[in-house]
Amino acid sequence: LGARLSTGSDLDVSTVYFSALRDKLDPSLELFADVVLHPAFPEADFQRLKQQQLVAIQREQVSPVQMALRVFPRLLYGENHAYGLPLTGSGTPESVQQITRDDLVRFHQTWFKPNHATLVVVGDITMDELLPKLERLLAEWNPGDVPQKNIQDVPQKDRSVVYLIDRPGSEQSIIFAGHVAPPEANPRELAIKAMNTVLGGAFTSRINMNLREDKHWSYGARSMLMSARGPRPFIVYAPVQTDKTAPAMLEIKKELDGIVNGQKPVTPEELDKVQRNLTLRLPGRWETANAILDDLSYVVQFGWPLD
């Protein structure tokens, strides 16, 4: 068929994706529908992937960056929040050891419902052509109730807390700082992203210029906002030379306080640079079918208006 078919998951959604040539659409759609409705979950493949995941967790537990990504969400959200799992996406050794093929089947039966799904299609096809094909292939897909995930707000901490993972012999320290930010779908999202770009979201951002270019303590430091429907992680990441760990933490706090507390607000020049950068990106955002698909999927996932 020359088609591409893949599946994936993130903090909020699971996806089934396929891409096919127009003259191969019908057989490709049949394969797509079969995966959505009747996933096989072969036992041999399941056991192989399970062992691969356990090995991946072992590797993560000796990598400083991966170690931090594993524990950081639990510190932000607590044990019972849906976002409190390791950001590596690999889970815990205990949960992976205990999972069975039946758990996969139950997950699919519980969550994969047509009333809980959205189909985004981009290509040389009309709705009049596509809809009858989908109605025929997905006719047996029955709606039903789905559980509610715990993505509630978490209380903001009233003071800063430092957690240390002691790893003797490390060549450098890995600093993760952050807190819980508003969900992606909020009326001030553009302003929040602009703020993050100035703070640590670009090479010329304040944190990177401070720790890399001015102090020469790091090869690169940055801040990031992860995408999520619920309260999402805001993270500052900085690998620094070991003897500058404490001073680097103070510099990061200084840069955060400068924006948050208004001690060093975003300048007109910084804002203009961010605005021009975002504007110049726009023409190329819809150049390919996949680019359009990504943007539309983003709109659907976070409930943005189509305009």
Pin down the residues of each PLM region:
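PEST-like low-complexity, intrinsically disordered acidic/proline/serine-rich tracts
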Residues: 58-66, 147
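M16 family metallopeptidases and their MPP-like homologs
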Residues: 1-36, 54, 66-94, 116-122, ...
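Conserved, carboxylate-rich catalytic/transport cores that coordinate ions
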Residues: 108
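PPIase-associated folding chaperone regions across multiple families
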Residues: 187-195, 199, 212
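An aromatic/glycine/proline-enriched structural segment found at the starts
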Residues: 81-83, 113, 118-183
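Short, conserved secondary-structure transition motifs
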Residues: 20, 53-60, 153-166, 276-285
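Peptidyl-prolyl cis-trans isomerase
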Residues: 38-41, 46, 99-101, 278
